[in-house]
Amino acid sequence: MTTLTLNTSLLSSRRILAAFSGGLDSTVLLHQLVLWRERHPDVTLRAIHIHHGLSPHADSWVRHCETVCERWQVPLVVERVTLADNGLGIEAHAREARYRAFAQTLLPGEVLATAQHLDDQCETFLLALKRGSGPAGLSAMGERSPFAGTLLLRPLLRETRKTLEQWAVRHGLCWIEDESNQDDAYDRNFLRLRALPLLQQRWPHFPAAVARSATLCAEQERLLDELLASDLTDCITTEGTLRLSPLMSMSDVRRAAILRRWLAMRNAPMPSRDALERIWQEVALARDDASPCLRFGDREIRRYQSQLWWIKSVAGQHETTVAWPVWQTPLALPAGLGTVQLVPGGELRRPREEESVSIRFKAPGLLHIVGRHGGRKLKKIWQEQGIPPWRRDTTPLLFYGETLIAAAGVFVTREGAAEDKEGVSLVWHA
């Protein structure tokens, strides 16, 4: 293996963050990147090691990675992640935590490089085949993928594991062996340790053939993307919701393709055929007076005003009151709802000295809002403003004392309106 493949993959990238576990694959990747940096002095290279805490050897792996990076003069970031049982399984949860840490560590203009190779590609394809995936899932991994507002590069994807090992031995590289890689209770390990050796013994070029099939599936997906682009434009609103009316006249196959692409745009996991059918039957086609909801982990699909919404699951906060004693500073909201802030310039009056400030999520009685005649209950205002039901007890309401002043981004009450130019605005960073 030469540096040619790597150079081609990274031709336009000058700031690189390399995922570095210390194992064979990532050690070869980092070594290749160090050689690339030597040939291109304008390249900035960093490495990141994820400490999952799953192995008793995890601390020694950190020390190994620190030693390697110090020798190669590569700045190393070590991120420790905590894995809790979220129903995904340990492999999927570890991967999720790992890539979340990658995304948080990337600097502006930096790309992420990972060490997946041809054998990994074959395993990914077979796992997708086992799940009954369609062309999107069978496309497996690309050499370049969008990630966290930048790119995820897989420069070694055309190389075999055997080739990487030959390179490492030839150059005297040292790497760690994760004992969990020998546990064939994990699906990927089962394929690598037991299934693929048999397949390659019979058909030596099996991984390369699988990679070609994955490439063909990816090409079919790109063609479908082109053919369905106009449909997607018609169906997706500026808020990112999916309009149902255009879908009603589509064939089942076309509609399913649109649903998959919409969910992909919302960064949702790829749904199974059964999941798509449930979305359509239980949510899209629910009774007009229903408020259908389908849970997917910590996310939900809901329907409102003939549109599908992909949202984060948040418990209602109607009984919650959050005191805001120092209203000049931002206030953190409960349940991951973000922060609120009162900033100078706006149509809200400032609180009087004797008024306490708080955020609540319900308001009793009739409310008089700026720009409307007469009083209305909060429920009626939500309906008039087109606020979806699940946002009605999670939208921050600003109170001075017992007086409702404003709902973030929705309305201002007459009691809260500024009478001079010294007003403030309620800004909600959800």
Swiss-Prot record:
EC number(s) per entry: 6.3.4.19
SUPFAM superfamilies reported in the protein's UniProt record: Adenine nucleotide alpha hydrolases-like, MesJ substrate recognition domain-like, PheT/TilS domain
Cellular component terms (Gene Ontology): cytoplasm
Domain of life: Bacteria
Keyword terms, alphabetized: ATP-binding, Cytoplasm, Ligase, Nucleotide-binding, tRNA processing
Annotated Pfam families: ATP_bind_3, TilS, TilS_C
Binding site for ATP: S21, G22, G23, L24, D25, S26
GO biological-process terms attached to the record: tRNA modification
InterPro entries with a match to the protein in the record: Lysidine-tRNA-synth_C, Rossmann-like_a/b/a_fold, TilS/TtcA_N, tRNA_Ile_lys_synt, tRNA_Ile_lys_synt_N, tRNA_Ile_lys_synt_subst-bd
Single annotated GO MF: tRNA(Ile)-lysidine synthase activity
Cellular compartment(s): Cytoplasm
Enzyme class label: ligase
SMART domains: TilS_C
Function (record text): Ligates lysine onto the cytidine present at position 34 of the AUA codon-specific tRNA(Ile) that contains the anticodon CAU, in an ATP-dependent manner. Cytidine is converted to lysidine, thus changing the amino acid specificity of the tRNA from methionine to isoleucine.
Family stated for the protein in its record: Belongs to the tRNA(Ile)-lysidine synthase family.
Domain notes: The N-terminal region contains the highly conserved SGGXDS motif, predicted to be a P-loop motif involved in ATP binding.
HAMAP family reported for this sequence: tRNA_Ile_lys_synt
Annotated protein name in UniProt: tRNA(Ile)-lysidine synthase
Organism, scientific name: Salmonella agona (strain SL483)
Gene: tilS
